[in-house]
């Protein structure tokens, strides 16, 4: 019986793919070597310890229907589209060794005609006339008895969109959490015009088989049929939840200020696990009562635009004469935290 397992996803859903990865990792025998190949439609994937409001332009992502996905490994934020190929190598300990999986990817690139080399802890780079350019980034996760190495290869990604989503709004965030480091990148199509996802997957697969001296049939993983993986439904529900993707952000503070025709407003939020743990409001408005009431209502509220709007608009019952001001305030707060 082969010790290898090859899985290929035909889904572009990042939550589905990361849930598949998590389930395979948890239930694989320690003697198995796994290769999982996949790709995501428009998504920003953040590291386990990152703050999405600090790393991403969450407002632009919402406008452009770009998903946010938090992975279980560390590292920084990356933008995925269908011009990326994603790979995951898994193995039990003591065999797990990220230098092996790195060499498999380098061998695959070499077979395609690309000479790349490892750089730093996580990257693969190629030489260009403008200097070294990153074509692959990786992250890692280890438990007591197993580990995985996952990463991306830039094939034909729309690099102009990286700045759209990975440069956050200049919000006044005093945030804990790991900040991403931006690197100079290039696509493999600059070196291999016309290279496809399928060709890259084939090259990685062949290099994987060659390294271990075994071959195995690929298993196609599809959302059309619930994968036969233990606890998949629960894992997918968690992976796709706001509580995981946003709510797991490290503790941070957010300062908002705005000048309206009826007065200036300054809001201070402390946020932990996606909930507002403290809200302070300062204003020179001639009628501060609605804002003072709002500060009380926001304590414990989810740090989410629709929930904040809901709390603002609930004040209309007690302060109907301030409807215009409260609606302006509601729209401003919702826009500021998206």
From Swiss-Prot:
Subcellular location: Cytoplasm
CC annotations in GO: cytosol
Reaction catalysed by this enzyme: L-lysyl-[lipoyl-carrier protein] + (R)-lipoate + ATP = N(6)-[(R)-lipoyl]-L-lysyl-[lipoyl-carrier protein] + AMP + diphosphate + H(+)
BPL/LPL catalytic domain location: 29-216
One BP term from GO: protein modification process
PROSITE patterns, per the entry: BPL_LPL_CATALYTIC
EC numbers for this chain: 6.3.1.20
Keyword flag Cytoplasm: yes
A Pfam family of this chain: Lip_prot_lig_C
Additional remarks: In the transfer reaction, the free carboxyl group of lipoic acid is attached via an amide linkage to the epsilon-amino group of a specific lysine residue of lipoyl domains of lipoate-dependent enzymes.
Protein name: Lipoate-protein ligase A
């Amino acid at each position: 019986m082969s010790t290898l397992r090859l899985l290929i996803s035909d889904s572009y859903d990042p939550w589905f793919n990361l849930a598949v990865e998590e389930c395979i990792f948890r239930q694989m025998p320690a003697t198995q070597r796994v290769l999982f190949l996949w790709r995501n439609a428009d998504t920003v994937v953040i590291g386990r310890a990152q703050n999405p409001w600090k790393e991403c332009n969450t407002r632009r992502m919402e406008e452009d229907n770009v998903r946010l996905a938090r992975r279980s490994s560390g590292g920084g934020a990356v933008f995925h589209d269908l011009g990326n190929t994603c790979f995951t190598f898994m193995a039990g300990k003591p065999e797990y060794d990220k230098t092996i999986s790195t060499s498999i990817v380098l061998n695959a690139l070499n077979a395609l005609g690309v000479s790349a080399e490892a750089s730093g802890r996580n990257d693969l780079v190629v030489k260009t006339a403008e200097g070294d350019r990153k074509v692959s980034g990786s992250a890692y996760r280890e438990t007591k008895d197993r580990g995985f190495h996952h990463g991306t290869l830039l094939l034909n990604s729309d690099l102009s969109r990286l700045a759209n989503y990975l440069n956050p709004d200049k919000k006044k965030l005093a945030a804990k959490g790991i900040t991403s480091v931006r690197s100079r990148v290039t696509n493999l199509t600059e070196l291999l015009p016309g290279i496809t996802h399928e060709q890259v997957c084939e090259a990685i697969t062949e290099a994987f088989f060659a390294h271990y001296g075994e071959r195995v049939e690929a298993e196609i993983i599809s959302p059309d049929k619930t994968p036969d993986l233990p606890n998949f439904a629960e894992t997918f529900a968690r992976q796709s939840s706001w509580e995981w993707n946003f709510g797991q952000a490290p503790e941070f503070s957010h300062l908002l200020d705005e000048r309206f025709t009826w007065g200036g407003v300054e809001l201070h939020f402390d946020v932990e696990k996606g909930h507002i743990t403290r809200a302070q409001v300062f204003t020179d408005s001639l009628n501060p009562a609605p804002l003072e009431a709002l500060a009380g209502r926001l304590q414990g509220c989810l740090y989410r635009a629709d929930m904040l709007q809901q709390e603002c608009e609930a004040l209309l019952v007690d302060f109907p004469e301030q409807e215009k001001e409260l609606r302006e305030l509601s729209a401003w707060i919702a826009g500021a935290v998206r």
